[in-house]
């Protein structure tokens, strides 16, 4: 519970301040549009995974066991893997109650393509009855089809870091559709990101917010990594495991106290996924 609370208050809320400041500008430069998209990617991850962790913690307190809903999605090497790690409960629901009843992948290629597109149309519609969510869902449906039928062998030959970077880029584009309330604004933002709108490459506000939040964004990126798994691969893992018995409770306590302090001193506390 404390870990989820800290994710929400310390990381998601701070990312939210960055996105709100940038979206409040009269216009965005290329650099500003990328900074907003990256900050929002971390905001929605720590926001949703944060209160998912809080729900798991509350369940443990009352003797219930809930499955993990997020499994470090930003280390995914493909979009397919991303959706096995992101919002696992939603993906499981659509797989069990839509994809498999339609025949799943046990049918011919044409029907398999149809099934995937139906699932992702409904996934987009589940988030909201507006064009940006429909396009968001079909965008992922198209990406999954490309990976499944065209890029599977190629991705196996590429270094892991290249696959992770390209997957994060594709996910970042998807979050732009998610961020805006209408499709035209999302498309304009993407045009700015890729230098297709005539916007300036950078601007003083983008530089300011980047410099003042660089350490925080690096911290958010590091917090997205599975450190427990990574540390278990080190030769000194036994020593680290022994130290973890008292270091982890100490870190969690400090994070919780910092979160309480931030809640008391700040009024900014949105819950993004509550609107879905």
Task: Enumerate the predicted regions with their spans.
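Membrane-embedded transmembrane alpha-helical bundles that form the catalytic cores
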Residues: 1-275
């Amino acid at each position: 519970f404390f870990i989820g609370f800290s994710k929400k208050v310390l990381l998601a809320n701070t990312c939210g301040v960055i996105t709100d400041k940038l979206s409040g500008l009269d216009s965005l430069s290329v650099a500003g549009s990328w900074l907003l998209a990256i900050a929002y990617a971390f905001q929605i991850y720590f926001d949703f995974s944060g209160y998912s962790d809080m729900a798991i913690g509350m369940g443990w307190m009352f003797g219930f066991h809930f499955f993990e809903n997020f499994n470090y999605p930003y280390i995914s090497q493909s979009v397919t893997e991303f959706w096995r790690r992101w919002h696992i409960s939603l993906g499981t629901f659509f797989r069990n109650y839509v994809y498999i009843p339609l025949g799943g992948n046990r049918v011919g290629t044409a029907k398999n393509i149809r099934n995937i597109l139906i699932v992702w149309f409904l996934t987009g519609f589940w988030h909201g009855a507006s064009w940006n969510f429909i396009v968001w869902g079909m965008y992922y449906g198209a990406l999954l089809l490309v990976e499944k039928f065209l890029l599977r062998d190629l991705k196996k030959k590429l270094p892991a870091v290249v696959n992770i970077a390209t997957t994060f880029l594709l996910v970042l584009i998807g979050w732009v559709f998610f961020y805006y309330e209408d499709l035209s604004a999302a498309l304009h933002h993407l045009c700015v990101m890729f230098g297709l709108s005539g916007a300036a490459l950078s601007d003083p506000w983008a530089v300011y917010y980047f410099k003042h939040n660089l350490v925080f964004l690096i911290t958010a990126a590091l917090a997205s990594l599975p450190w427990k798994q990574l540390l278990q691969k080190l030769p000194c893992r036994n020593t680290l495991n022994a130290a973890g018995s008292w270091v982890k409770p100490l870190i969690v306590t400090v994070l919780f106290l910092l979160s309480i302090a931030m809640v008391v001193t700040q009024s900014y506390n949105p819950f993004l996924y509550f609107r879905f």
